[in-house]
Amino acid sequence: MVHIGAPRDARSLTDEVKSRARRYGSDLVGIVSASDLDAVPSHWIGHRDYRCYTKKTTHYLEDARSLIIMGIRVWDDVFETVIRVRDHDEYPEEWRGQYYARRLVRFLEGEGCKAVLEPDLLSKKRMAQLAGLGNFGKNTLIINPEYGPWFRLRSILTDAELVPDRPFTDDLCGGCDRCIKSCPVGALTPYRLDPDRCLLGMTWEQRRSKEFGKIWDEHCPPLTRNTYLMCMTCQRACTHGRELRGLD
């Protein structure tokens, strides 16, 4: 249903977007202007599902103006489960976040705006830092002062004119390198992850190999024949968000 009446001003619409995002289930929400994200140089994404360079917002929406970045807290190990389906992994926690974001997309469309759910070649981590959600940590995750690394990101690109938030500029890592030292396979160096070395980036054959099999079973314990917990070692090592996660 398209909104009828005078269009909202940017501040009013921004406030409504943030209110709805929290009401739908997000714990964190921030706004980035499309031009600010596009000003970030294209960089390599070593994702578990694809590896390529980031794109500009106009790759998805010619008249893109704003990005909404949502942070959904993961407060229990159940949110870190992975299901092996035939020859690939599925992450049930992603479905929850996508549901919250999809509801916000429907609201924007009802306001007469265009909205793209999860433009996958735009860096959600860069969005999160630009939107003030946290800093890019040495474990390559976004670290929030309250939640630490224990939240997941969902994003929406829209032609709506929204009021951007201030970037996060504090350094929450400082001289700490606990996450780097904790990695069982040495996949981390400061602010960089080797996706081929990371347990979650390995092929199924590598995970069951003589070299990595025992490490895999220790850090990605099986729950059923086809379900396991993803490795959280570098997250557990982080000093931020520990109390809320029940680690202290």
Where are the predicted features?
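Catalytic cores of enzyme domains
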Residues: 79, 85-248
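Non-catalytic, usually N-terminal nucleic-acid engagement modules in DNA/RNA processing proteins
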Residues: 1-86
